[in-house]
């Protein structure tokens, strides 16, 4: 895990032996499971350390304290939620993943990593956000899903408690995308708080963290039915 350790040193973070072992196990299980179902196109040891593990942990630049209630929307193979949980064991983590096969991997890897305080939710975000058990219950929500910011706002902000934040990793020039998302962010009860540049070893490709703050309750009609936020963003 030399690449990960080096990258974390730039953040002033060091891993203990247990955490190093967990990341090693995570890599081995990811590659093994990926041979049976498609979890990720990134499988080389160095690339996983940088593009999955370090990229996930870079969310600490947004001021994560380590004791939050965090929801990872569209978690896939567990990024960024599980690397953050390894780093901060006190986080109460929800992993929301609609694809059953991926959700099964998340359940299995959570056990193999010896993690507690993790809930796997295998449902669509649009449906889950209307459930009182999850709606406006999280202090932090994140998603690495490849989606327009307007769509992401509708799929993430309804989970945020007022005063909570959404952390959305993005890359490249996002000014136009953020302009398009202004309506969706406002309708969900949010505001753009700040945009943070990510400049870490191996991640010098224009990565950014978009921070949204939840300032009022999301109206009951949002999010709209499954698939609509992606097909017809609120712009």
Curated annotation (Swiss-Prot):
Q: What is its EC number?
A: 2.1.1.-
Q: GO: which molecular function terms?
A: rRNA (guanine-N7-)-methyltransferase activity
Keywords recorded for this protein, A-Z:
Cytoplasm, Methyltransferase, rRNA processing, S-adenosyl-L-methionine, Transferase
In which residues is S-adenosyl-L-methionine bound?
74, 79, 97-99, 125-126, 144
| One Gene Ontology cellular component | cytosol
InterPro entries documented for this protein? rRNA_ssu_MeTfrase_G, SAM-dependent_MTases_sf
Reported function = Specifically methylates the N7 position of a guanine in 16S rRNA.
Name recorded for this polypeptide: Ribosomal RNA small subunit methyltransferase G
């Amino acid at each position: 895990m030399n690449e990960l350790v080096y990258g974390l040193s730039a953040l002033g973070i060091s891993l203990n032996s247990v955490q190093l072992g967990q990341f090693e196990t995570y890599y081995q299980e990811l590659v093994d499971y990926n041979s049976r179902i498609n979890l990720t196109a990134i499988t080389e040891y160095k690339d996983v350390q940088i593009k999955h593990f370090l990229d996930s942990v870079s969310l600490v630049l947004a001021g994560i304290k380590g004791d939050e209630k965090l929801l990872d929307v569209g978690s896939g193979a567990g990024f960024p939620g599980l690397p953050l949980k390894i780093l901060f064991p006190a986080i109460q983590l929800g992993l929301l993943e609609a694809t059953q096969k991926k959700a099964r991997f998340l359940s299995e890897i959570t056990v193999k990593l010896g993690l507690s305080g993790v809930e796997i939710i295998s449902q669509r975000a649009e449906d889950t956000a209307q459930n009182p058990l999850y709606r406006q219950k999280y202090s932090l929500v994140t998603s690495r899903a490849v989606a327009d910011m307007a769509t992401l706002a509708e799929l993430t902000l309804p989970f945020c408690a007022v005063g909570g934040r959404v952390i959305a990793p993005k890359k490249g020039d996002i000014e136009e995308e953020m302009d398009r998302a202004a309506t969706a962010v406002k309708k969900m009860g949010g505001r753009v708080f700040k945009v943070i540049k990510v400049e870490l070893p191996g991640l010098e490709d224009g990565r950014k963290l978009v921070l949204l703050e939840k300032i009022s309750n999301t109206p009951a009609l949002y999010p709209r039915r499954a698939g609509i936020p992606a097909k017809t963003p609120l712009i």
